A protein has these predicted regions:
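A short, charged, Gly/Pro-tolerant segment at domain boundaries
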Residues: 141-171
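Glycine-rich phosphate-binding loops that contact phosphosugars or nucleotide phosphates
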Residues: 8-127, 133-137
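HTH-adjacent hinge/linker in prokaryotic transcriptional regulators
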Residues: 1-2
């Protein structure tokens, strides 16, 4: 509930990032959250992208980090710097707890065991969907208005029969 409150607070920019595999979860969360509220950014999964994002991370900001075993030094370093700059840190991690747990204000754990050599992302995706549902419930009707506005803006940028025509005119 506390994490949903934080994510629903429109006055607090939210930055999201992950590791080698979990970056996809951060991108999925951002793809939903920005439709519900402003100021939601994914931090690029590159050394320069991470450093560049830190330029703008400030005291009221939230850094939501996905970090599961095979914990990455660059993700830990990014979080350490964001925390030093005053960001609230939300960590989504496995039961073994990323070292980021020591820095985090909020820690959510997900099971990652799978019948393969790779950790399962399914529980992380389910948690993303639960967080999004919580934010929708918290923000109420304002989310519908924002989504409607976004859909209206997208009308000129989506595929339709005319866009598929070579001449751009009706055939």
């Amino acid at each position: 509930a506390a994490v949903v409150e934080i994510l629903a607070d429109r006055k607090r920019p939210v930055w999201m990032t992950g590791g080698r595999f979990t970056q996809a979860c951060a991108e999925m969360l951002q793809a939903h959250l920005y439709q519900l509220r402003p100021n939601c950014q994914v931090i690029a999964y590159t050394p320069a992208g991470r450093a560049d994002a830190l330029l703008d991370v400030a005291r009221r900001d939230v850094l939501l980090v996905f970090d599961v075993r095979r914990y990455q030094k660059d993700t830990i370093a990014l979080t350490r710097t964001a925390k030093a700059q005053g960001a609230t840190v939300v960590l989504i991690t496995d039961p073994w707890l990323s070292p980021i747990a020591d820095l985090a204000d909020h820690v959510l754990t997900v099971d990652v065991e799978a019948p393969s050599p790779y950790d399962s992302m399914v529980p992380s995706v389910a948690l993303v969907e639960a967080l999004v549902a919580g934010v929708v419930a918290k923000l109420g009707k304002t989310t519908r208005s924002r989504i409607s506005n976004l859909e209206r803006l997208r009308e000129g940028y989506t595929w339709d029969d005319q866009a598929l025509s070579i001449s751009g005119e009706d055939d």
